[in-house]
Design a protein with these regions (language model features):
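Conserved cytosolic headpiece of P-type ATPases
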Residues: 1-732, 737-740, 753, 768, ...
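Generic alpha-helical transmembrane segments
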Residues: 711, 755-756, 780-795
Length: 876
């Protein structure tokens, strides 16, 4: 339908909706059920259980194991034997492993989907006459969208009202140009690129405001099949997953070579070829950590959910890895370091006696109320904190907001922009017109040629300008945020509502000073940062004196630090900025464009940088930073789309908590990797050493596969949810350290060798002291039990680099549960006779269990001693 060629009235009639009230909730729900959710379907969609299950077998080692089981059946059948039990057990374990793989994959996917839903875009619509914020997926045809600067446009629509609306449609056109919109009727044959009375899904609002009737949603939009912000699917591997995948493949090759050597040695020692082949294949399957990337995904997803409960939504998995190595946090001041609850504490104007001049005070407050975007909802004033504070001050000063807005409605505006640092509105005024401009004093004063002095207008000469600047400086020095207001009277309605037309030859009226006190928790968070080797930096559009005063109160600014302003940045080369950034903790009067330079200056020093932002123009800085942090409450959808993480409470302390969690998650992944690799090396060592010395095979193929099943998944995942060490924020950032740094490789090798030696010792004791001559069943049973149980016990060693006596044994209930289930399963296959027969083991007596228990517990004291030596070495 050619919506662009219809009048707004015709569009509303066709859509069966009302401009002032929108759809009712019931009607919107009906349309949602009929038309479906507002999203573009993308990719293959969710895999079925069958596809997921079959995908688990798409692995060379698993296929080799199945082939070995089939060969076992064929050989048994060829030899006229009826014993297919080994093959059946191997296949059963393979199938059980596949089910566990599907379960892990499903859990990770559900967790990631839940997190995507939390960070999905929102839309402001009229429903039943009330403005509501709803998930963008719930927008339907006929909804009335209310657009403002920074909003993500989630549906195609026809513009009904337009107030300086400009959009960026690069997601559709490929060109990042600002497109000025209009509301007039266009010809039917107007090209898509010229339909300026339409907005398109996948674009966003650069400036201005608008009211739009939704004409198409989901697959019916122009963007159609193109992947836009709303349906963003990020399935790329994270750097850590890639690294682990490569590590796994390397270890896999090593395991295959060792298993090949074991097979060859077995043949040289005249061992039966087929049992040796089965042992080698089973060992390879058990020893290769093919589940590492999947376990890491689960650990990351669980960590992300935990962070979501603490008001941090992670949008991209790599952000979790990067968080732990953050060295600089560049934070906005307002709302992040402060309470975002401004209160006007002082008014100033040219001349004296403002405190006694009630009429002039009321006039200044009236101007601030006219040039203001706040709204009243019941008894509450809703809006941006600065504007809300001005409106509240006006009400307290006797100005009726409702009466003023009805008497002097807004007929035009030039919206605020970070570049101009000004906002202007136009109103009728007693048969004439008045334009009101408010904004940064240093910018606004330059636009003024006259001023109010006493009860009259006067020339804004050098003396009066100096007086205004002095009063501005005094308020700023007292950490007040200062906003100035000016006006211009018009005999006729202005022809053009542009900054060039309206923001000149103004009459300076006065200034308001307001305070946004620091958040109580921000000071403690700054202190934690500094202990953790993280440098907090304040970035603000406020006056330098205001910023410095707040930063000093928070502990960000210290004696010897410097403060840089946007004006100084403009005059600096990139090299000079890099040098200046070394001592700078406060950047004041900066624009969003400056933020990118600040980020790059720190990055050139080799620092990992986190940056906060909330506006449309903050998006480049958020993308440039190693970790982009968007604001959840006051952030635009564009900023959220560019960010790696979203702070749902806009709080600096939440960033610090996220860094703590990020460090904990990274350490937990290290723990899981350490545990898996040391356990797998233990399994290889058990068989390899036995072959080297010409001993009988300590473990049978099905026993190796069972150990792999019991010890690999549950304990590793349980380690992934371990609470972070209490001193995690007292350590310096990782700064690109390898996953295997701090001697981890040697510890893995030594601990793996220890586990292997314990299993061999159990095999030797069982065979020599408890087996009948020529039998190995007790020795194998004891080796089987020790190998499995010692790995489960060893998981506790992974919990901390500190002594286990320093942490709570009940601190990780999931690990206790994994240990209980693993021990129960292991003891069950030995002590339950039918299972013992299947696994070719025998029930153990009390003495044998005591020996098994003593050997299985050995990793605890040995690793405690290793940790003690390591701590002493580090101190030296």
């Amino acid at each position: 339908m050619e919506w662009w060629s219809m009048t707004p009235t015709e569009v509303l009639k066709k859509l069966r909706t009302e401009e002032r009230t929108g759809l009712s909730e019931n009607e919107a729900q009906k349309r949602l059920e009929t038309d479906g959710r507002n999203r573009t379907e993308q990719g293959e969609g969710k895999k079925s259980f069958r596809r997921r299950f079959l995908a688990q077998f798409d692995d060379f080692m698993i296929l080799l194991l199945i082939g070995a089981a089939v060969a076992s059946v064929a050989i048994s059948y060829w030899n006229g034997e009826k014993d297919f039990l080994d093959a059946a057990i191997i296949l059963a374990i393979v199938v059980l492993n596949a089910f566990l793989g599907v379960l892990q994959e499903s859990r990770a996917e559900k967790a990631l989907e839940a997190l995507k839903a939390l960070s999905a875009p929102k839309a402001s619509v009229l429903r039943g006459g009330e403005e509501k914020e709803i998930p963008a997926e719930e927008v339907v045809q006929g909804d009335i969208l209310l657009l403002a600067a920074g909003d993500y446009i989630c549906a195609d629509g026809r513009i009904l009202e337009n107030q300086g609306l400009k959009t960026e449609e690069s997601a559709i056109t490929g060109e990042a140009l600002a497109i000025e919109k209009e509301e007039g009727v266009l010809a039917e044959k107007t090209l898509p690129s010229d339909r300026k009375n339409m907005v398109l899904a996948g674009s966003y609002v650069l400036a201005g405001r608008g009211t739009v009737a939704v004409t198409a949603t989901g697959m019916a939009t122009e963007i159609g099949q193109i992947a836009a912000l709303l349906a963003e699917q990020e399935e790329r591997e994270t750097p850590l997953q890639k690294k682990l995948g490569e590590t796994g493949r390397l270890l896999g090759m090593g395991a295959l070579i060792i298993c090949g050597i074991i097979f060859g040695m077995g043949l040289l020692r005249r061992q039966p070829p087929f049992p040796m082949f089965m042992t080698s294949v089973s060992l390879a399957v058990a020893a290769i950590p093919e589940g590492l990337p999947a376990i890491v995904t689960i650990v990351l997803a669980i960590g992300m959910q935990r962070m979501a409960r603490k008001n941090t939504i992670i949008r991209r998995l790599p952000a979790v890895e990067t968080l732990g190595s953050a060295e600089v946090i560049c934070s906005d001041k307002t709302g992040t370091l402060t309470q975002n609850r401004m209160k006007v504490t002082r008014l100033a104007a040219i001349g004296k006696g403002l405190e006694q001049d009630e009429e002039k005070r009321r006039f200044i407050l009236t101007l601030f109320t006219l040039c203001n975007d706040v709204k009243r909802q019941g008894t509450k004033i809703i809006g941006e904190p600065t504007e809300k504070a001005l409106a509240e001050a006006a009400e307290e000063g006797g100005v009726s907001l409702k009466g003023l807005w009805e008497e002097m409605p807004r007929i035009g505006e030039v919206p605020f922009s970070s570049e101009r640092k000004l906002m202007t509105t136009v109103h009728p005024s007693g048969g004439k017109w008045i334009s009101v401009t408010k904004g940064a004093p240093d910018v606004l004063l330059e636009k003024c040629t006259r001023c109010l002095d006493g009860g009259r207008q006067a020339v804004f000469d050098g003396r009066r300008k100096s007086e205004a600047r002095l009063k501005n400086g005094e308020m700023a020095a007292n950490a007040l945020r200062v906003v100035a207001v000016a006006f211009r009277e018009w005999d006729e309605e202005p022809l053009f509502f542009t900054a060039e037309e309206l923001e000149r030859d103004l009459v300076f009226a006065g200034m308001a000073g307001m305070m946004d006190p620091p958040r109580p928790e921000a000071q403690a968070a700054v202190e934690i940062c500094q202990k953790a080797g993280i440098r907090p930096v304040m970035i603000t559009g406020d006056h330098a004196l205001t910023a410095q005063a707040i930063a000093a109160e928070l502990g960000i600014y210290r004696a010897g630090d410097t403060v840089l302003t946007g004006q100084e940045l403009e005059q600096m080369s990139d090299e000079a900025l890099e040098r200046a950034a070394e001592d700078c903790t406060v950047f004041a009067r900066v624009s969003p464009a400056h933020k990118v330079r600040i980020v790059k200056a720190f990055q050139k020093e080799g620092r990992v940088v986190a940056m906060t932002g909330d506006g449309v123009n903050d998006a480049p800085a958020l993308k440039a930073a190693d970790i982009g942090c968007a604001m959840g409450k006051n952030g635009t959808e564009v900023a959220k789309g560019a960010a790696d993480m979203i702070l749902m409470d806009d709080n600096f302390a939440t960033i610090v908590e996220a860094v703590r969690e990020g460090r904990g998650i990274y350490e937990n992944i290290r723990k899981a990797v350490h545990f898996l690799l040391s356990s797998n090396i233990g399994e290889i060592m058990t068989i390899f050493v036995a072959m080297c010395f010409g001993w009988a095979t300590p473990l049978l193929p099905i026993q190796l596969l069972w150990v792999n099943l019991v010890t690999d998944s549950l304990p590793a995942i349980a380690l992934g949810v371990d609470p972070a060490d209490a001193d995690s924020m007292e350590q310096p950032p990782r700064k690109g350290n390898s996953l295997f740094s701090d001697g981890m490789v040697s510890r893995i090798a030594l601990e793996g060798a220890m586990i292997g030696m314990l299993a061999l010792l159990a095999f030797g004791i069982g065979h020599i002291y408890f087996d009948e001559e020529g039998a190995y069943i007790t020795g194998r049973t004891m080796a089987f039990a020790v190998l499995s149980l010692s790995q489960l016990i060893h998981a506790f060693n992974m919990r901390s680099e500190h002594s286990l006596f320093r942490i709570s044994p009940l601190g990780n209930p999931m690990l206790l549960l994994a240990l209980f289930i693993g021990c129960l399963m292991q003891i069950g296959v030995i002590m339950v006779l039918p299972l013992a027969e299947i696994f070719k083991v025998c029930p153990l007596n009390g003495t044998e269990w005591l020996i098994v228990g003593a050997l299985a517990l050995t990793p605890l004291p040995v690793v405690e001693l290793e940790k003690l030596c390591d701590r002493r070495r580090r101190k030296k």
